[in-house]
Regions:
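Conserved acyl-donor/pantetheine-binding loop and adjacent beta-alpha core of acyl/acetyltransferases
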Residues: 69-97, 102-105, 158-163
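Conserved acetyl-CoA-binding loop-helix of GNAT-fold acetyltransferases
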Residues: 100, 106-119, 142, 146
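Conserved GNAT acetyl-CoA-binding A-motif
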Residues: 114, 121-132
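Conserved GNAT-fold acetyl-CoA-binding loop/helix
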Residues: 3, 24-45
């Protein structure tokens, strides 16, 4: 049975393992995401999110299989995006750093996490959903498109110290 909950301190080792697994997959040519093992996402990414209370984990049969950050923090790169919908900051919920353990892929966990994110946004009275991915991450782009997210812009940037990122900004309006 799938359960999504706020992460706890005791979850950090498993979250770090999932981050390492996705980095291994990319380094072995099994995925194209655009992240960097030494820069992002790393354990400190999860620790900072845990401290803000916006780190969420997905469990299946009590085993953590995916992790994401959900909050109202719009990264600075969003200021350069041509968003289609106007929204006040407190009306926007942002989905960051979704990672499904590569050993658990193709089970619908990504879709289920996005569904949770949308419900979470509604519960917090947010009408605008925003997220991003790297232009090279075709798997994520396809999934988000299939879930009704519109790519509104591609912003070139240095993201979290990773150079030459083409930042795809996506949005979906709930109202």
């Amino acid at each position: 049975m799938i359960n999504i909950r706020s992460a706890k301190q005791m979850d950090l080792d498993r979250v770090e393992m999932i981050y390492n697994n996705i980095h291994d997959e990319e380094e072995n040519g099994m995925a194209t995401i655009g992240w960097n093992r030494d820069i992002y996402p790393v354990r400190k990414t999860a620790e900072a999110a845990l401290e803000r209370n916006d780190l969420f984990v997905m469990e299946d049969e009590k085993r953590i299989v995916a992790v994401a950050i959900i909050n109202q923090i719009q990264v600075p790169e969003y200021a350069d995006a041509a968003w289609k919908h106007e929204a006040k900051e407190d009306e926007v919920m942002v989905f960051h750093t979704l990672v499904v353990d590569p050993f658990e892929k193709k089970k619908g966990y990504g879709n289920a996490f996005v569904s949770f994110y949308e419900e979470y946004a509604k519960q917090h009275n947010c009408k605008e959903l925003r997220m991003d991915t790297n232009v090279i991450n075709q798997r994520a782009r396809k999934m988000y498109h299939n879930l009704g997210y519109q790519e509104v812009d591609i912003v070139p940037c240095v993201f979290n110290g990773i150079p030459d990122v083409q930042f795809v900004c996506l949005e979906k309006c709930l109202s």
